[in-house]
Curated annotation (Swiss-Prot):
One of its GO terms (molecular function) is promoter-specific chromatin binding. This is WD repeat-containing protein 13. The gene is Wdr13. It comes from the Eukaryota. It comes from Mus musculus (Mouse). GO terms for cellular component: centriolar satellite; nucleoplasm; plasma membrane.
């Protein structure tokens, strides 16, 4: 069963940064050999139930051995070899829909593990339950993350030395999305309502635009990097999604929206990058197989409005979708079939578009509950706690920003798990980039970057937080350099 061995490899890859932290070559050899063995064993035809049991036990054992994970972007930053060893090009992608064992699984309903979030919480608490409040993490697992995070306060850590570079190739058209490549310090991409996507390289100096991806006939609303960064998926107002090769910028495939509607957002399934979820203007969410260009059977659902934002949890079992009428829906994602099952609905505020959703399974040692960061045109940034394994949400706190009409986005900072406090970053219609400490009871504002001349729509950190990119409604992309302590 191809999907299961990919999930096992993904679990191993997430923990790989913790193996022999001072000898990265050993980690590279390990994950390559692991990939080879898993591929060979996948052909042996073991029963799917046995494979799933192995996956579950493997995850539990790794969790007990190495402790709770920080987010993939921070943990894997120490091991770029993981990316190379788990490349997912179209040539090597498994045909998800044609897998006979996956097809056979459709004959019965397969639910998500009911204890997945409880297990995560137990694993997280186990490391800390006997420690006094405020004590440092007492495990060797913390060394790498503490070294990357440093011993400075949040205010000191998020002091910026100024602008590193300004990209203006999309000037006069909004840039709704900017993203650094996964586990990469210097590769950046941004999409524009002029219908193109830019792939940029920040090092060696001077920063350059490597490729401009053209093909969409209307504005590009969103895009996403694959885990291995070799593929990008983009969605457009021209009612198509496109698959691009990042190495040379060529379009590999164009896939029309099943409803013929404007496509407004997209995200990769984090465990199986053969699947991408898209949201459209006809209120629908679709799971798409990018190898076949087809919609996955059972992988569609309808919301109450235009789908503007999507986000998976780290294991890929929960999906949240936000619409322009103020609702956030959670879905259970069946790993075997790609089927979506609608679970919960939260009305953030009736009539207020939900423009951004960012999920984080483990914010910091002071905030270990799975969390969701939401922008919703309320002049507030909202932080929710995920309270059960069906994605139900409970408001934890809010932060004041200016957002009443623009599609502003926000992110969790990637290296926050072992700091005192935890930081989030958001754009704003006041033309500034805002930093907030989610654990600080009063005066949560940590920093504010000024330099844009239009509402800031999106923000993105590179893997080690040395650079931050922000994009605005006038088409400007600013790369900020963090002050070195």
């Amino acid at each position: 069963m191809a999907a299961v061995w990919q999930q096992v490899l993904a679990v191993d890859a997430r923990y790989n940064a913790y193996r022999t932290p001072t000898f990265p070559q050993f980690r590279t050899q390990y994950i390559r050999r692991r990939s080879q063995l898993l591929r060979e064993n996948a052909k042996a035809g073991h029963p799917p139930a046995l494979r799933r049991q192995y996956l579950r036990l493997r995850g539990q054992l790794l969790g007990q051995r190495y402790g709770p994970l920080s987010e993939p972007g921070s943990a894997r930053a120490y091991s770029n070899s993981i990316v190379r060893s788990s490349r997912t090009t179209l040539d090597r992608m498994e045909d998800f829909e044609d897998d006979p064992r996956a097809l056979g699984a459709r004959g019965h309903r397969r639910s998500v593990s009911r204890g997945s979030y409880q297990l995560q919480a137990q694993m997280n608490r186990a490391v800390y339950e006997d420690r006094p409040p405020g004590s440092v993490v007492p495990t060797s697992v913390a060394e790498a993350s503490r070294a990357m995070a440093g011993d400075t306060s949040l205010s000191e850590n998020y002091a910026f030395a100024g602008m590193y570079h300004v990209f203006d190739q999309h000037v006069d058209e909004a840039v709704p999305r900017v993203r650094f490549a996964n586990d990469d310090r210097h590769r950046l991409a941004c999409c524009s309502l002029d219908g193109s996507i830019s792939l940029c390289q920040l090092v060696p100096a001077p920063p350059t635009v490597l490729h401009v991806l053209r093909g969409h006939t209307r504005g590009v609303s969103d895009f996403a990097w694959s885990l291995s960064n070799d593929i990008l998926v983009s969605t457009s107002l021209d009612a198509t999604m496109r698959i691009w090769a990042s190495e040379d910028g060529r379009c590999i495939r164009e896939i029309p929206d099943p409803d013929g509607a404007e496509l407004l957002c997209c995200t990769f399934q984090p465990v199986n990058n053969n699947l991408t979820v898209v949201g459209n203007a006809k209120h629908n969410v679709h799971v798409m197989n990018i190898s076949t260009g087809k919609k996955v059977k059972g992988g569609s659902s309808k919301l109450t409005g235009r789908v503007l934002a999507l986000s998976f949890d780290a294991p890929g079992r929960l999906l949240w979708a936000g619409d322009d009428r103020g609702s956030v829906f959670s879905f259970l994602f069946d790993m075997a079939t790609g089927k979506l099952t609608k679970a919960k609905r939260l009305v953030v505020h009736e009539g207020s578009p939900v423009t951004s959703i960012s999920a984080r399974s483990w914010v910091s040692r002071e905030a270990r509950d799975p969390s969701l960061l939401i922008n919703a045109c309320l002049n507030k940034l909202l932080l929710y706690r995920v309270v059960d394994n069906e994605g139900a949400l409970q408001l934890k706190r809010s932060f004041p920003i200016e957002q009443s009409s623009h599609p502003v986005r926000s992110i969790f900072c990637p290296l926050m798990s072992f700091r005192q406090g935890a930081c989030v970053v958001t754009g704003s219609e006041d033309m500034c980039v805002h930093f907030f400490d989610v654990e600080r009871a009063a005066k949560a504002a940590v920093n504010k970057l000024q330099g844009h001349s239009a509402p800031v729509l999106d923000v993105s950190f590179n893997c080690d937080e040395s650079l931050l990119a922000s994009s605005d409604a006038s088409g400007m992309v600013i790369v900020w350099r963090r002050e070195q302590k």
